[in-house]
């Protein structure tokens, strides 16, 4: 530490003072008893909340509380001792730990994973009828993601002029997939955000072609940039995904063949593919913002406030889901009881 720098003081965050912690501490046991009796539908077909959901709430109530454990730290410069409460490191309930995970994940991917090349975000949403199975069956979720990644790879191979005559088996993409289980209004909405290097990597013998532009500096790899990825390109990608995903659901016995054919004919199919966001190679700050967006937690403490006996959650977007709320909620707000808030959060806790 320099002689002129002012030392920073460690201030415990005191989660017990936050509105969310107070609501969970006061109402969680009541919700757990009612949910186990089938009074809430946030847990799907299983009335009793799953063990990982109960564990997430239990850990959250201990996170940052000194009574549940702490570490003693000592400053090597001044010799001052201070205590740091243990954190839960949870992924679904704790706003502090999920925000820290978001920041650390984005920084790591930006600094150590993504090369200095253009990165495009691909987003896939599917109809609610299919989301039901994806939300409850990890194998189905993985199946849809694999199909999505294969179609992205085929699209980039086709639109990378430098790789037009290459063997497709030797061309690969670089991608990080984020599975979102939530929508902007604390609703269940499983969909994918995939950040993909905008082009393909070619495996070559030795050091590769020194004249290739641009080129990754790793031995045996050449990068071929993609061009012409626009709305006209994405439209057939969406059609291809729609056909392949429905065919896969039929093959698994999750859809009848006649239902899949009907869904192919819908004007508004519920399938949506977007690839409009592309970050230039030099704009690392924008890339980190995109990665934070993709790794963000399901809800924000800053959007939650209390009005009388009710909780009001301000949604990031105007709600599209139907509602029977007669409490005067605005289109971009949710009016919830503490039990309803806990139930919504519980439904968004990701499985281990």
Residue ranges and their predicted role:
Residues 1-352:
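Beta->alpha loop/short-helix hinge microenvironment recognizer with preference
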